[in-house]
Amino acid sequence: NDMRYRSNFGFIHTSGNLFLCRKYLGASGIYGEKIPLIRLAEMYYILAESVALSECGQYINAVKNARGISRAYDVGTDVTEEQRLEELNKEYQKEFFAEGQYFYFLKRHNMKTFYRCPVENFSAYVLPVPDDEKTYGEAE
């Protein structure tokens, strides 16, 4: 019953090799032209990452319940750090589909891969330090 699956997921094939993400289709006015800088769900997830393990469930559950997920799937108060990251990992994938935020979550937690990852490790995403930064900056 997760409302994110009904509206966000999937791509629409238009012509040739062009695919459009359904998440952003159909919005009109300013909502069709802008993507929010930060969303309430992201703030809740940041809180869930930073508070004590016994408190993280209330923030994750607030988002899950607002998305129509049954309270039977709520995160309890007796979670481990691994369980917290696993739950946040699942929620980031659903909440920030096609936005790029999930990539930063993976980098922040030094997670190397995800299901069907097209790149073996994230070293492919590390850009070299610019020469000016080596010459004039503090980089080595």
Give the ranges of each region predicted by the language model:
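Acidic/polar-rich alpha-helix caps and helix-coil junctions
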Residues: 1-140
